[in-house]
Amino acid sequence: LLAESLSQEEIHALMNRVELRQMDGRDMAQVPLKLILEIALERTLGLKALSFGVEAARTSVIGARERNHPLLQTSFGYSKSASLSSSSGGNGGSSTNSNTLTSTYSQKLNNGMTYGFTYTERTSQSTSLTAKDWSSVESSTSGDPYSQSSLSANLKIPFFQDSGSVINNIPVKIAEVGVDRAVLNSKSSKLGLLQGIASIYWNLVSIYQSIELQKNSVAISEQLLRDNQARQRAGQLSPTEVLSSETQLLRDQQTLYSLKQEALKVEDQVRAALNLPTLPVGLFPSDSPSIHSEDLKDAESLLRKILENDTQIALSKAGLKQKQIEILQFENTLDTNLDLDLSYTLKGYSTNSFGGTSEFGNSNLHGLSATLSWAFPLGDRKTQEGLRQKNLESRQIQIQIEDRKSELEVQLQSILRDFKVLEEDLNTAQAVSLLSEKQLNNEIKRLKLGKSTSYQVSQFQQDLARSRQQEILKRVNFEKNFLELLVLSGELYKYYDLPGN
């Protein structure tokens, strides 16, 4: 369902899930990250496309399991043949008209054996031919029509090559590996998409917190300008100082405007990711960045979860499983092809169509056959090299799995180290912000006493804005690192209580 086709009822249902607030004359929906992720799972077209891919892979398994369906073949034929021969009594022969009905039922079993039944009904009538010379042939008497009925039971048993359920169920196993791959690819893509949306969300948080800080800077600049204008009118301040205050105010207002424009762009990114290009309200992130120190577990348990959850390792294991199946296929090709074909036939004759079936119980008309055939693959270098190739590829995948485990361990160490560094940086940024705020307040007091200038105040004001901006960035980076850890460990769905894990 495309966002453009949202009905008023659907928009109303979405609005009921949020709280509204006014911000700069604009209606804003306060949205926590949990709700954003829930809507992403419900509406993102990319996730819906992934579900179709998984469903398509599952249908291939059903098809592979039903590959050995029974087969019924029926044919009807008519033939006429004539022949002449020469004898001492003259030239003569016969002409035969035949109608043949054949029906065969066969099925291959999952263990490689094939059985079947064939019923044949043949109705014939012969006419005698005489020829006074070879150029003139005439028919004489016609014999009575008769029918021949036969029922055959056939069984083919492979002993080495193509024998057993393990070999014959290889198509099912390959299809099941395909399902595993589709599910893992879907899981990886889904987590990547959710991580991307969450990262955009935290960017939006950073921008709106910066907007609030910039509003404070604008308020300070406005108050400072009013104070300076009042002091100028009282003759206590030069016009240059007032002009400097006006310049700082314009600079702060311009920065605020740029931040608001940036917020709209990032908000558009969120709505595009959620497949909601048209909404009657804006989006305001209600979550605040946190340190999450209580959510961090010990490195050993985190590494264990990461290794269990990593889709690259799981995909490599699925690839290794498929290589093992392909090795079985090559080994099966190199096996001796030894087959036993058994057949037992019942026959009956009658002057009436299908009347011969009543004679099937006559053992004198029964027949049987047994054929043992075998073939040895001599010098099949192609299959041998193919088998060697699959063994080498299996070993390659095993090494790739170990390499990925080592990579994840280093990545976890890097993330945990970044947590410690970010926490220290955040404490430093907070301390710098407090000092910058004190310095700004002191400088404003000195300005009122005529011991400072508006330019110096603006410099301290910019220092405070930069330090607070750094504090916001540190907190947001902490959230993004924590988000990466949730994705790696497979805890994203559990942490935000999301459906459909």
Predicted features, each with a name:
Residues 24-28, 76-153, 285-296, 327-332, ...:
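Small/polar, glycine/serine/threonine/aspartate-rich low-complexity segments that form flexible
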Residues 439-479:
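C-terminal structured "cap/appendage" subdomains that terminate the fold
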Residues 232-239, 447-451, 488:
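A short glycine-centered flexible hinge/capping loop motif at secondary-structure junctions
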Residues 48-53, 65-66, 110-134, 141-145, ...:
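Sec/SRP-type N-terminal targeting helices
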Residues 2-98, 155-170, 174, 285-321, ...:
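Bacterial Sec-pathway N-terminal export signals of envelope proteins
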Residues 183-305, 418, 422-425, 463-465, ...:
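Periplasmic alpha-helical coiled-coil/stalk elements that build and connect Gram-negative outer-membrane
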